[in-house]
């Protein structure tokens, strides 16, 4: 993510840095218009940490008292975590976090819905390339395999 390099530049040369995820204003507005009406009292964002943190901030700009937790299977930097944020080790950790944390809304890759059997909350699709790869860039399974170079 570049954090290691940014921290070295800060330490060695005093160059300040900030974390964030650049998104065009129009794309951000459209995204927020789509998700805000669907958010419950406790939202869990399952994604890459810096992007998830950015979405958390967007939500709080509109709903200052919103309870928003970030979780993911990929490395999470401790200095960028808030209380309640979690690094997940396995799929069962996601279901446990949702149930134990009384989460009523999840933003995550569509494939992760399967890891929440019986959960009755609102699931909002937020594709994550390392989870589902090319699946969201094609219409059918046949298109996927064709794009992957298989001829069947």
Over which residues does each language-model region extend?
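An N-terminal assembly and electron-transfer interface module characteristic of large anaerobic redox
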Residues: 1-152
